[in-house]
Amino acid sequence: MCSLATNLLLPSKMKPVFPEKLSTSSLCVTTRRSKMKNRSIVPVARLFGPAIFEASKLKVLFLGVDEKKHPAKLPRTYTLTHSDITAKLTLAISQSINNSQLQGWANKLFRDEVVGEWKKVKGKMSLHVHCHISGGHFFLNLIAKLRYYIFCKELPVVLEAFAHGDEYLLNNHPELQESPVWVYFHSNIPEYNKVECWGPLWEAMSQHQHDGRTHKKSETLPELPCPDECKCCFPTVSTIPWSHRHYQHTAADENVADGLLEIPNPGKSKG
């Protein structure tokens, strides 16, 4: 997705190693031309490849989930990763996060995966998307601001990938297009450790409304599920093992990058 650690300073006269049509989503900042040398230095930062979603670049895997059916009692979970070698996206659709898809030194270093899950809270469906901004190692901390910007810029493409890969679900349940999208940015830096509501799914997929600067941010947090087991909510234990401590920042959140913090049942935690 975004090999931020391997971003190159490419002279403007050199041809990039990837096709022009795949570099449209790059964040390019050209410095002033040097008076001594007639060429620019262009730092290139890539995240999800093309800014415009290309279905041909998406590989969809259904793991323990029927492609044409949505389980009534369990949430639907998406795990999206990108290969810098093939420039293709891999989307796993299952009932829990696909941890095997996140193995390998590159994935652990760059942390460019995006995971999401459908939740039902008090009878209402919503899509919860998680992005890792910083924490875990110092390099991600240094570029937290850039990672936050790029994730915001490219998330509409991610949502399109979710919708395309799980098209049977959305075709059978068109009302999900109106479901709100909650985006969780996980960071050990309070400024970027936040939750944003991007509005209904159909609106969140509109790229021109989300450029990392203009999208509307929520001033409230998602509604919590019922504290006790009920029929109007999905299970309160999230299928995504990342910290959800956006409600109250604690010292333990400094390790949020590890993605291994257990998410407690909010109802049982009171007891």
From Swiss-Prot:
**E.C. number:** 4.99.1.10
Q: Does the record carry Ribosomal protein as a key word?
A: no
Q: Which family does it belong to?
A: Belongs to the staygreen family.
Its name, as the record gives it, is Magnesium dechelatase SGR2, chloroplastic
Gene coding for it: SGR2
Query: What does the UniProt keyword field contain?
Result: Chlorophyll catabolism, Chloroplast, Lyase, Membrane, Plastid, Thylakoid, Transit peptide
- Per the record, what phenotype accompanies loss of this gene's function? No effect on seed degreening; probably due to redundancy with SGR1. Sgr1 and sgr2 double mutant has an embryo stay-green phenotype.
Example of a GO MF term: lyase activity
Q: Where is the transit peptide?
A: 1-54
GO CC, sorted alphabetically, is:
chloroplast thylakoid membrane; plastid thylakoid membrane
Record-level GO BP terms: chlorophyll catabolic process; negative regulation of chlorophyll catabolic process
Oligomeric state and interaction partners are given as:
Interacts with the light harvesting complex II (LHCII). Interacts with the chlorophyll catabolic enzyme (CCE) RCCR.
Q: Where is it located?
A: Plastid, Chloroplast thylakoid membrane
Known role: Magnesium chelatase involved in chlorophyll a degradation in the chlorophyll-protein complexes of photosystem I (PSI) and photosystem II (PSII). Contributes to the degradation of PSI and PSII in the thylakoid membranes. Required to trigger chlorophyll degradation during natural and dark-induced leaf senescence. Mediates chlorophyll degradation during embryo degreening. Recombinant SGR2 possesses high dechelating activity against chlorophyll a, very low activity against chlorophyllide a, and no activity against chlorophyll b.
